[in-house]
Amino acid sequence: MLPREMDNVGVLHGLWGEAVAVDYLRRHGYEIVDRNSRPVVKDERLEIDIVAWDRRKDEMVFVEVKQHAKPSPYARRLQSVNRRKRMNLRRACNAWRRANRWRGAFRFDVIEIYGVPGGGQPVIDQISNVELFAKRGRFVRWS
């Protein structure tokens, strides 16, 4: 495969993963508020995959979706969300909250999708309440 084709495949898999995550969130009672939001127009890195309202907890949820073909025995959960990505997510979420004048409760979740389009039922792992300020380079879960 050529590098350009690999990029297209990666983009398609990412879009598929986001669609799977949206479906998952809706089935679990979340209302989708925004998708692929770029609250800072001048900075393409600042993107929020999904913004959803959790009716059960009355809080806004900023969701980062990570799609993998299959689980790796060598990778820990959340490993693909590195320090730079966490920093960009924090900035994007703060910008979204300012732009939408959101003053209520909020949290950050990561949804990991294991599977590929047409490859059967994907495995979905939702990690809630992820802290974007890592301690010693590692993620910390609040709950």
Give residue spans per PLM region:
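Protein kinase-like catalytic core scaffold
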Residues: 46, 59-61, 109, 125
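Short beta-strand or tight-loop elements
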Residues: 29, 46-49, 106
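Conserved catalytic cores of phosphodiester-cleaving nucleases, focusing on short active-site segments
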Residues: 48-72, 89
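Catalytic cores of nucleic-acid endonucleases
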Residues: 67-117
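Domain-level recognition of nuclease-like catalytic cores that cleave nucleotide substrates
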Residues: 99-143
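A short acidic/basic microdomain associated with nuclease active sites
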Residues: 26-43
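Short, conserved glycine- and acidic-residue-centered signature motifs
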Residues: 14, 18, 44, 81-85
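Interdomain/boundary linker segments immediately adjacent to catalytic/signaling cores
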Residues: 1-23
